[in-house]
C-alpha cells in the first residue's frame, strides 16, 4: 500500500535503534520526490544523522538532504550533500535530479578551476569529491563517443591533461579519421572560446606536439597552430618536416597562407632560418611576400573597373583650393585605385594637384603609396621623384613620399626599413626646424608601417630619439611608429617608458599618439593588458583615457568578452570627456568583430543618444564590426544617421555605411544605387557642411575601392585568425578624426576579391576555368555613374511694370478662388492613385527580391576564369572542375587568395597570365615546353 504522508517515516528517525533509522531513511529516499515538502521540516535531523560519524547509513542521509535541497532550489547545498553521499549518489541514474546535480557540479568545478588557474584566489580549495564527479563524467562522455563534449568541458575547466589523454587515445585508435577532426575542433575552440592567453598557448603547443610525429599529419591544421602561436621556431620545424617528406607543393601552399595571415616578425625570422639551411629558393621567395603582392597587383590592374566619372564629379564639385576638400578627393582617389598601380587620374589632373597647399600636398603625395600598395619591386622607383634628395622642393611632398613608401611596403618592409630609418637618424638632431619636422613626420609613419610587428630594436631607438625631442608634429608620428613597430609584443620596458612620457609631455598630440601606441603594443594580449588598461582609464588626463578605450579594443579584439563589453558600455555613458565616450563606443566594434550580428542591437540605443559623440561612435562601431558583411540590421541603424543634425555624425554614418556595403552588388542589396546617389548628392549640395562632404567623398572611395575589386576582410577564413593588418588599418583609420592623412591607413584593410590559382612547379598563373553554381548576373558590378544630359536650362525672368503686375495678380486671385475646390478634388484623386501605384511597385519589388534571394543557386554552372573577381558571398558557389588539368593541392573549401595547383599534364604547354612583375622583367623568360618532330615534310610547311 502506497503512503500518502511521510510523517510515520519521519517519526521513526527519532528512534534510538540505528537499524530502524536506516530503514526509515531507505523508505524516505524512495518517496522523497513526493514528500519533500514534509521532509524539509525535518532537515536538521537528517543533516545531524549525516554529521554523526558513528551512524553507518549517514551517506543515505546525505542523499536525502541533497534531494530535498534540490527540490527547494538550493543547488549549491544539493551538490554539497550529493558529493557527501559518495557511492549512494548514482551518476548513471537517468533522472532530472541527477542530471541537474551533475550539471551544477561541473559548473562549480569549472568556476573553482578557473579561479585557481587565474590565481585570483590562492585560498580556493577544490573538493576532491567534485573532481571525482568531473572525471567520472569525462569517462562517461568518452565511453559514449561524445568526444567533442568531453573536450569542450575539459577546456573550460583548464584540464589540459584530460584533453591530452582523449586526443592520444583517439590517435592510438585511428591516425587519420576522427582524430584529425577532433584536433581541428580543439584548435577552433582554443582560438575562439578560450580567453586566457597562457592556457591558449599551452593548448596550441600540445596540438603541435601531437601533430608533428604523425606519419600522415594534416599539415594545414599544423600551420594554423603555428600562425596562432606566432612562433618562428615551430614554423621552421614544420617546413623542415615538409622538406624531408618532399612535399614541395604543400609547403608552397602553407607559405602563401603564412604570408596572408602571419606577422612580419614570423615571416622574417622563418625566412632567415630557412636561408641558413639553403632551402628551396621558390619557398624563400614566397615568404618575402613579393609573389603574393605581384599576383594581387596584376589582378587589380587587369580587372580594374574604376568609376572615373564618379571621381571626376567629386573633384569638380569640391573646390580644390580648400585643404579639406582637396584631401577628401586625394583619399578617395587613393582608395579607388588602391593596389592597381594606375595613377592616370593624378597625371590627368596635374592642375588640380597644383592647388594643394601644405598638408594637402602631404596627403596627395602619400596617396600614391595607396595606389601602388604592394608594388614591392618598383615601389621606391615610383616614389623616387618625390623623395628627399629629388628635385622636389616642398617639405610636404618629401614627407608625404616617405609616408607613401611605408604604405607601399606595409607588412613587407624588409627592403625599405633601413632607407627610412636613415632619414630618422640623419634628421632627428635638427628637430624644431619646420622642414625637418614634416619630413620626420612622414618618415616615422613610413618606418612604422614598414617595420610593423617586427620589434626591430634599431627602429625603436631611432623613433624614440625623435619622440624625446618633444616636438608636436614629429613626436606624434614617432609615437604611432613605435606602436606599429612593437605591435602585439607587450614589451614591458617600452610600455613603462611610453606611459611615463605620455604623462610628462605638454603636447596633447604626443600624449594621444603615445596612448594609441600603448594600445597597439597590447594588440591581442587580452588579460595580460588589464593592469595597463586600468592605469590608463584611471588617469585624470582624458587623452590617456582615450588610449585606454582603444587598448581594450585592440587587446580584446574579436574575443566578444562580456566583462569587457560591460566596461566599454559603462565608459561610454559615464566619462566626462566626449572623445573618450566616442572611443569607448567605437571600441565595441573591435571587441565584437566575430559576433558582428549582435552589434546593431547593442549600439541601437547609443545611436539614438542625446550625445552626438556617442552617436558617432555607434556609427563607427557598426562600420568596423560589420565591414564587408552587408548586414541589413547595420544598414537599418546607419541610414537614418546619414541625416543626423550633427555634421560629424553624418560623416561617420556615411563612412561606416560604405564599410558595410563595400563589394555589395545591386542584386545582392538593392540599396547600393540609392546609397551611392545619396553620397553624391551630399558632395554636390552647396548647403552641406564641409565635414559631411568630406565623409561622403571618402565613403564613395571606399564603396568603389581597388577598382571595385577589394573588400574588407577582418578574419582570415583559412587559418581562422584575425587579419592583424586589416584590424590595425581600421584602428589607425579612426584617427583621421584628428589628422586627415591617417585616412590612408584604411588601405591596409583592403583584401582583393579573387582566387589566384598558381602552378606549384614554377609559381606561374595558368589560364583555366572554374565552375560557379550561381546565377550569372548576381555578382556583376553596380552600374557606372552617368550624369543626366537633359538638364533644364534656367530661364531668365523678363521685366514687368508694377501696374501690369498688380492687375495680373488681381485677375489671378479671382480665378484661383474659383478653381480651388476643383483642383483640390483632382489633387486628392491623383495622390491616392500615386500611393496605390507606389504600394504595388514596392510589393512587387519585395516579392521579386525575396524570390531572387531564394533562387541565387543555379544547377547549371557558368565558367569563371582563373584570377577573376570572386566576391566573398560568391565563394560558396565556386568549384574547381575535377577533370580540369589544374587541381588544388589542398581541398578547396570556398576561400579566396592564392591557391597552389597541381599540374596533371606537366609535359604539355600551358597558357600563362603575365604578371606586372613579369611584364617589367628585362631578363629573357624561360622557354615554354615544346615538342620536337623528327621527320618534317618541308613541302607541306
Swiss-Prot record:
<dbReference type="GO" id="GO:0031625">
    <property type="term" value="F:ubiquitin protein ligase binding"/>
</dbReference>
<dbReference type="InterPro" id="IPR011989">
    <property type="entry name" value="ARM-like"/>
</dbReference>
<dbReference type="GO" id="GO:0030234">
    <property type="term" value="F:enzyme regulator activity"/>
</dbReference>
<dbReference type="GO" id="GO:0043161">
    <property type="term" value="P:proteasome-mediated ubiquitin-dependent protein catabolic process"/>
</dbReference>
<dbReference type="InterPro" id="IPR002015">
    <property type="entry name" value="Proteasome/cyclosome_rpt"/>
</dbReference>
<dbReference type="GO" id="GO:0005634">
    <property type="term" value="C:nucleus"/>
</dbReference>
<feature type="repeat" description="PC 1">
    <location>
        <begin position="363"/>
        <end position="396"/>
    </location>
</feature>
<dbReference type="GO" id="GO:0008540">
    <property type="term" value="C:proteasome regulatory particle, base subcomplex"/>
</dbReference>
<dbReference type="Pfam" id="PF18004">
    <property type="entry name" value="RPN2_C"/>
</dbReference>
<feature type="repeat" description="PC 4">
    <location>
        <begin position="477"/>
        <end position="511"/>
    </location>
</feature>
<feature type="repeat" description="PC 10">
    <location>
        <begin position="695"/>
        <end position="731"/>
    </location>
</feature>
<dbReference type="InterPro" id="IPR016024">
    <property type="entry name" value="ARM-type_fold"/>
</dbReference>
<dbReference type="GO" id="GO:0042176">
    <property type="term" value="P:regulation of protein catabolic process"/>
</dbReference>
<dbReference type="Pfam" id="PF13646">
    <property type="entry name" value="HEAT_2"/>
</dbReference>
<feature type="repeat" description="PC 9">
    <location>
        <begin position="652"/>
        <end position="689"/>
    </location>
</feature>
<keyword id="KW-0677">Repeat</keyword>
<protein>
    <recommendedName>
        <fullName>26S proteasome regulatory subunit RPN2</fullName>
    </recommendedName>
</protein>
<feature type="repeat" description="PC 2">
    <location>
        <begin position="400"/>
        <end position="437"/>
    </location>
</feature>
<dbReference type="GO" id="GO:0043248">
    <property type="term" value="P:proteasome assembly"/>
</dbReference>
<keyword id="KW-0647">Proteasome</keyword>
<comment type="similarity">
    <text>Belongs to the proteasome subunit S1 family.</text>
</comment>
<dbReference type="InterPro" id="IPR048570">
    <property type="entry name" value="PSMD1_RPN2_N"/>
</dbReference>
<dbReference type="InterPro" id="IPR040623">
    <property type="entry name" value="RPN2_C"/>
</dbReference>
<dbReference type="InterPro" id="IPR016642">
    <property type="entry name" value="26S_Psome_Rpn2"/>
</dbReference>
<feature type="repeat" description="PC 3">
    <location>
        <begin position="442"/>
        <end position="476"/>
    </location>
</feature>
<comment type="function">
    <text>Acts as a regulatory subunit of the 26S proteasome which is involved in the ATP-dependent degradation of ubiquitinated proteins.</text>
</comment>
<feature type="repeat" description="PC 8">
    <location>
        <begin position="617"/>
        <end position="651"/>
    </location>
</feature>
<feature type="compositionally biased region" description="Basic and acidic residues">
    <location>
        <begin position="816"/>
        <end position="854"/>
    </location>
</feature>
<dbReference type="Pfam" id="PF21505">
    <property type="entry name" value="RPN2_N"/>
</dbReference>
<feature type="repeat" description="PC 5">
    <location>
        <begin position="513"/>
        <end position="546"/>
    </location>
</feature>
<dbReference type="GO" id="GO:0034515">
    <property type="term" value="C:proteasome storage granule"/>
</dbReference>
<dbReference type="GO" id="GO:0004175">
    <property type="term" value="F:endopeptidase activity"/>
</dbReference>
<feature type="repeat" description="PC 7">
    <location>
        <begin position="583"/>
        <end position="615"/>
    </location>
</feature>
<feature type="repeat" description="PC 6">
    <location>
        <begin position="547"/>
        <end position="582"/>
    </location>
</feature>
<feature type="region of interest" description="Disordered">
    <location>
        <begin position="808"/>
        <end position="854"/>
    </location>
</feature>
<dbReference type="Pfam" id="PF01851">
    <property type="entry name" value="PC_rep"/>
</dbReference>
